[in-house]
Regions:
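N-terminal subdomain of lithium-sensitive/metallo-dependent phosphomonoesterases centered on the IMPase/IPPase/PAP
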Residues: 4-97
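DPxDG-like acidic metal-binding loop motif
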Residues: 91-102, 106-129
Length: 132
């Protein structure tokens, strides 16, 4: 993890390569963590594996992250819930939208189409979308 995700820049669009690579690695590792569960007809276990991986890796980043779109409300999801704070609490503040495993049924049935997703923006720039 670099000293700064921006170097001398303050705009998210100017994020450095190290920061970009960290985000790519987070989604890759979340996707790979699902591999042992492919085709086992248990979408809950597959989703838990991806969520655990993504949360663990987000918490290693030098950011103050706020999940604005996640796995559900705090009382419905144990991790990556809306409002959860992630990162080391050092560095710039971000809003984060995640879906560690989009297409849980595809993964459970070993079908193509499941993906791991993360979107990140400067604080207060992502629409906070609690599920209704």
């Amino acid at each position: 993890i670099g000293k700064s995700v921006f170097g001398a820049r303050k705009n998210l669009m100017d994020i450095d390569k190290v920061f970009q690579d960290q985000l790519i690695k987070i989604t890759q590792e979340a996707a790979v963590s699902v591999y042992p569960h492919l085709g086992k007809n248990n979408k809950v276990i597959a989703d838990e594996a991806a969520t655990n991986s993504m949360r663990t890796n987000l918490n290693k980043m030098n950011i103050k992250g706020n999940i604005v779109i996640g796995e559900g409300e705090m009382d419905e999801a144990p991790m990556l819930y809306i409002g959860e704070k992630v990162g080391t609490k050092k560095g710039p503040e971000f809003d984060i939208a995640v879906d560690p495993l989009e297409g849980t049924n595809f993964a459970a049935k070993n079908l193509p189409g499941a993906i791991s997703v993360i979107a990140i923006s400067n604080k207060n720039n992502l629409f906070n979308a609690p599920e209704s």
